[in-house]
């Protein structure tokens, strides 16, 4: 029974962090509403080859990530749990791979479970793993690729080694079909330092074609199918989504080279105290511990690769956290009390700092000129304070006996995990989580023949909630500019200066609803035709125009 306790503890972490809260969290726009709607449309249409978003061609990503979400919605229905489940499931599988690789590297089950728990409870991993985006899926395939490569290079010559390289190729192929060519580049860059240090070039050249075969065999059927259906897909996907995003000055999400340093530091909480020592030890042992050096390359090379990219988002470095968890678990097992005590102090201070920030800055009575919470949200303030008090309390608990209790740090994010969905300020909900607003005005929306929105994310929320993909865009095209450029999408977008004339004619055919997300700080809508009904909540406004009989 004693030997089962670590495994049970890991399963409890996964359940409490990644499964229990999912049903109680609204969808964020634009990301979560986007991916929810794309998969809903795939299931509704039966077309799993060409991605469509609001009925328009959407070529920003390949299809496998959507397929995972499709299966989730098919299994769990039209629910927020289903939308989030694909990400959480991918993180859980990656945690299992972390455990497996620890067994292969060090033959230590306890160390493997510790590494999996560290991975699952890292702040960045948890934040992304409960957020409906595709990054957990690509992290899963990259972890599978790195595990397959390690299995291959450790296997004796023959069919087992070949099978390992074939599995590497399959994982890379699935990664390519999830997020593109980075799934091919990142594993190559990650293993490069180890291959050079171990002088394994000959083996890679001999067995590498098997990996290439696996990748091609996995992805080629879909590659051909979408090229036949949509000949322009590969031009857009390669040039816009790869070349421009990585290299051009007008790339999306531009950030400086050092952007990922603070992201890494914050993302490793509640294990930040272990980070410097784990990296330092792996570097010092690069000559004697080939496994540790393999993990170090897996951490550092993707970080450098994405730091060189012009476009940056915190989610991009998620693949580096699996090897980082392994290195930190190994370091913690032998580092002694000092680093473990530092880790506890950092968690205590972080929790207290966040408590002070929520209670004295963000609260209605706080120091901020425009507090995040308003007067009737004291309950939410208290929930936020309680969530971070749990973090501080667990940090303090580990300080009582650092060498014995340090693993309890995995429980630091528990309060946030269980309470954050109930502590979101209303002004944030009214701008970033449109589901509640949509449900309030649902009767007006359901009787509208035409529905417009001036935000792609809000439009996606409307489509998801109403289960209709014909939501059109008003004034701003955003990420759907490419899909709207096709002739068959000409009636799916209207500019503000044309709206009055369009409205005069189309109101003869049916009611019109326009949902506007006001710019931050703007309070009036005086430049649009007067609506028959108006409803406003925060920055979201519904303008309803009734049908006019000819």
Swiss-Prot record:
Protein keywords: Cell inner membrane, Cell membrane, Glycosyltransferase, Lipid A biosynthesis, Lipid biosynthesis, Lipid metabolism, Lipopolysaccharide biosynthesis, Membrane, Transferase, Transmembrane, Transmembrane helix
Keyword Kinase set for record: no
GO molecular function: 4-amino-4-deoxy-L-arabinose transferase activity; mannosyltransferase activity
Gene Ontology BP terms: lipid A biosynthetic process; lipopolysaccharide biosynthetic process; protein O-linked glycosylation; response to iron(III) ion
Membrane topology: Multi-pass membrane protein
Membrane-crossing residue ranges in chain numbering: 4-24, 81-101, 110-132, 176-196, 204-224, 255-275, 288-308, 313-333, 348-368, 381-401, 409-429
GO cellular component: plasma membrane
Catalysed transformations (reactions): 4-amino-4-deoxy-alpha-L-arabinopyranosyl di-trans,octa-cis-undecaprenyl phosphate + lipid IVA = lipid IIA + di-trans,octa-cis-undecaprenyl phosphate
Location(s), subcellular: Cell inner membrane
Lineage top rank: taxon: Bacteria
Pathway it works in: Lipopolysaccharide metabolism; 4-amino-4-deoxy-beta-L-arabinose-lipid A biosynthesis
Broad enzyme group: transferase
Enzyme Commission designation: 2.4.2.43
Family to which the UniProt record says this protein belongs: Belongs to the glycosyltransferase 83 family.
Described purpose of this protein according to its UniProt entry: Catalyzes the transfer of the L-Ara4N moiety of the glycolipid undecaprenyl phosphate-alpha-L-Ara4N to lipid A. The modified arabinose is attached to lipid A and is required for resistance to polymyxin and cationic antimicrobial peptides.
Protein name as annotated: Undecaprenyl phosphate-alpha-4-amino-4-deoxy-L-arabinose arabinosyl transferase 2
Native source organism of the sequence: Sodalis glossinidius (strain morsitans)
Classification lineage: Bacteria, Pseudomonadati, Pseudomonadota, Gammaproteobacteria, Enterobacterales
């Amino acid at each position: 029974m004693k030997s089962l306790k670590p495994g049970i503890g890991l399963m409890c972490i996964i359940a409490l962090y990644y499964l229990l809260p999912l049903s109680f969290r609204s969808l964020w726009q634009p990301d979560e509403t986007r991916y929810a709607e794309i998969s809903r449309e795939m299931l509704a249409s039966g077309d799993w080859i060409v991605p469509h978003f609001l009925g328009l061609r959407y070529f920003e990503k390949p299809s496998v990530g959507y397929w995972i979400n499709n299966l989730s919605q098919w299994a769990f229905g039209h629910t927020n749990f289903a939308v989030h489940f694909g990400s959480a499931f991918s993180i859980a599988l990656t945690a299992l791979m972390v455990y497996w690789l620890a067994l292969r590297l060090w033959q230590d089950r306890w160390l493997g479970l510790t590494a999996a728990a560290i991975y699952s409870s890292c702040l960045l991993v948890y934040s992304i793993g409960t957020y409906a985006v595709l990054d957990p899926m690509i992290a899963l395939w990259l972890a599978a690729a790195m595990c397959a490569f390690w299995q291959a290079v450790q296997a004796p010559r023959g069919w087992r080694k070949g099978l390992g390289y074939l599995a590497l190729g399959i994982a890379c192929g699935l990664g390519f079909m999830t997020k593109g060519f980075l799934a091919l580049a990142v594993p190559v860059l990650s293993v490069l330092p180890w291959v050079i240090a171990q002088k394994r070039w000959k083996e890679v050249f001999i067995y590498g074609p098997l990996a290439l075969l696996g990748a091609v065999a996995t992805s080629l059927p879909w590659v051909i199918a979408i090229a036949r259906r949509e000949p322009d897909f590969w031009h857009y996907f390669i040039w816009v989504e790869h070349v421009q995003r990585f290299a051009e000055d007008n790339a999306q999400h531009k950030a400086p080279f050092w952007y990922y340093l603070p992201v890494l530091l914050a993302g490793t909480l509640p294990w930040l105290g272990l980070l410097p020592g784990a990296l330092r030890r792996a570097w010092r042992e690069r000559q004697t511990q080939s496994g540790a050096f393999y993990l170090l390359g897996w951490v550092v090379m993707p970080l450098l690769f994405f730091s060189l990219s012009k476009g940056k988002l915190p989610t991009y470095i998620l693949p580096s956290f699996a090897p980082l968890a392994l290195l930190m678990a190994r370091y913690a097992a032998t580092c002694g009390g000092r680093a473990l005590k530092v880790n506890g102090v950092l968690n205590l201070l972080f929790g207290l700092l966040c408590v002070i920030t929520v209670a004295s800055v963000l609260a209605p009575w706080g120091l901020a000129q425009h507090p995040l919470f308003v007067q009737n949200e004291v309950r939410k303030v208290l929930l936020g304070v309680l969530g971070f008090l749990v973090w501080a309390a667990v940090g303090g608990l580990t300080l009582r006996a650092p060498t014995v209790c340090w693993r309890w740090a995995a429980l630091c994010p528990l309060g946030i995990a269980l309470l954050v969905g109930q502590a979101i300020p209303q002004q944030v909900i009214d701008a970033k989580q449109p589901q509640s607003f949509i449900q309030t005005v649902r009767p007006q929306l359901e009787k509208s023949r035409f529905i417009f929105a001036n935000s792609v994310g809000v439009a996606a929320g409307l489509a998801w909630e109403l289960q209709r993909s014909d939501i059109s865009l008003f004034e701003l095209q955003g990420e759907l500019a490419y899909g709207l450029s096709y002739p068959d999408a000409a009636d799916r977008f209207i500019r503000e200066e044309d709206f009055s004339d369009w409205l005069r004619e189309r109101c003869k055919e049916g009611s019109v609803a326009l949902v506007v997300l006001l710019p931050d700080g703007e309070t009036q809508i005086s430049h649009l035709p007067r609506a028959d009904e108006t409803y406003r909540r925060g920055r979201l406004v519904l303008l309803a125009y009734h049908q006019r009989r000819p």
